[in-house]
């Protein structure tokens, strides 16, 4: 019970940082970016309804680029970058668990999808040698490997909450007004918590599951749009 409450709390904090997207979007007041943000979400919903496999593959590729931005140089698009290892390692070490997760996402060929993630994860290990950076990468690879070995797929969640989230907030604080960033994160977390509480109390969970392709497509679209916004404020 306490563990589940903690997971919900951590999820709320993580979701809350997505509201910080509004800082660069509103600061530029570029309607094209705002329109693109909404369009990406709509396209992903439509795409996931038609072909969950392609939708999920695009999400995996975009997420790997996004996670690679957690490491220097952060203003480069790296594919495959070390962020692909974040997704590829669980596919290698927790194959059955990952395959069951892919089946829940209605992936048509889960084994082929796993192989793509594994190849990308292995290829991503070339990055520290190409960059001749042998300091942070071995430490991260060892730590993350241990994390996945102990916690399985939940290790990805812990990585996002305890590494990706602080890095993202730190970068935003360096670039924008720290008070605005922190307050936006707090407000976003409160809004996220209220929405999650409403969904749970009104027992919408079954309805969400019945329409999971729409929900998953929307979530993928929102996260892809978040990754796009991150690329924008990193001046790519």
Which residues are covered by each model-predicted region?
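Transmembrane helix interruption/hinge and helix-loop junction motifs
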Residues: 1-5, 46-56, 147-156
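Cytoplasmic-side transmembrane-helix entry/capping segments in multi-pass membrane proteins
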Residues: 28-35, 57, 75-85, 134-141, ...
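Membrane-water interface signatures at transmembrane helix termini and the short loops
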Residues: 137-173
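Hydrophobic core segments of alpha-helical transmembrane domains in multi-pass membrane proteins
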Residues: 6-14, 53-65, 155-165, 214-220
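C-terminal ends of transmembrane helices
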Residues: 16-27, 62-75, 123-132, 166-175, ...
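N-terminal signal-anchor module of multipass membrane proteins
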Residues: 1-23, 216-222, 232-235
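Hydrophobic, membrane-inserted alpha-helices
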Residues: 36-46, 61-67, 121-124, 137-146
């Amino acid at each position: 019970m306490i563990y589940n409450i903690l997971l919900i709390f951590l999820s709320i904090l993580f979701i809350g940082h997505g509201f910080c997207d509004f800082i660069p979007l509103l600061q530029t007041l570029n309607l094209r970016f705002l329109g693109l943000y909404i369009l990406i979400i709509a396209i992903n919903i439509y795409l996931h309804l038609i072909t969950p496999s392609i939708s999920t593959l695009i999400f995996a590729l975009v997420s790997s680029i996004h996670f690679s931005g957690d490491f220097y140089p952060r203003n480069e698009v790296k594919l495959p970058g070390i962020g692909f290892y974040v997704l590829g390692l669980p596919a290698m070490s927790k194959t059955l668990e990952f395959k069951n997760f892919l089946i829940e996402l209605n992936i048509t060929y889960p084994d082929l999808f796993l192989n793509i993630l594994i190849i990308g994860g292995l290829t991503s290990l070339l990055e520290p040698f190409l960059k001749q950076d042998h300091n942070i990468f071995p430490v991260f690879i060892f730590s993350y490997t241990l994390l996945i070995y102990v916690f399985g797929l939940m290790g990805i969640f812990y990585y996002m909450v305890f590494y990706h989230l602080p890095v993202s907030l730190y970068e935003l604080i360096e670039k924008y007004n720290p008070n605005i960033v922190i307050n936006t994160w707090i407000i976003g977390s409160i809004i996220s918590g209220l929405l999650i509480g409403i969904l749970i109390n009104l027992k919408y969970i079954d309805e969400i599951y019945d329409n999971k392709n729409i929900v998953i497509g929307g979530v993928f679209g929102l996260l892809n749009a978040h990754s796009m916004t991150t690329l924008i404020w990193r001046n790519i």
